[in-house]
Amino acid sequence: MKYLIAGLGNIGKEYEKTRHNAGFEILDTFAKASNIAFITKRYGDIAEVKYKGRTFILLKPSTYMNLSGNAVNYWLQAEHIPQDKLLVVLDDLALPSGTVRIKGKGSDGGHNGLKHINQILGNSNYARLRFGIGNDFPQGYQMEYVLAKWTKTEYESLIPHFETAVETVKSFALAGIEKTMNTYNRKN
């Protein structure tokens, strides 16, 4: 069974290890732990991970955050993956740093990547894993905050949380959304 795991972020060296690229970091953690490299293909970087009878197509869109729907839709079609096997991994300002939350569907929560995916797919009926990046910034500085790089200390402290997010992704495919929500939404 195939699953499309779309990690949201922005391409380019200047965006590496920024808070807004938490989705990319989580997919990088998954691929690295599986000894799999990403390959540049249409609309993004792709890695295919096989785990316990499941195939995970990891997608890091090259469309920039605000046009993520184009890449997600293309790869759903190209791999013949139904929307209920889609999991979008993204950063979330509303959650404390390192917190992992998964749910089966919902609003875009003001996230431009989700807004575009909803627009292109025509609905919001897909799972999403939100990774908390906190909101420790002065009023009016949200953009600067999300596009800022984590400090070395912050990043190192988040590595176990990236690993928890990867375990949550695996559970989504192995145990289903409900059991995964019950297990991982309570952990942190």
Description of each model-found segment:
Residues G110-G113:
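Hydrophobic alpha-helical segments within soluble ligand-binding/sensing domains
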Residues M1-G104, K115-L129, D136-Y141, A148, ...:
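Nucleotide and nucleotide-moiety/phosphate-recognizing core
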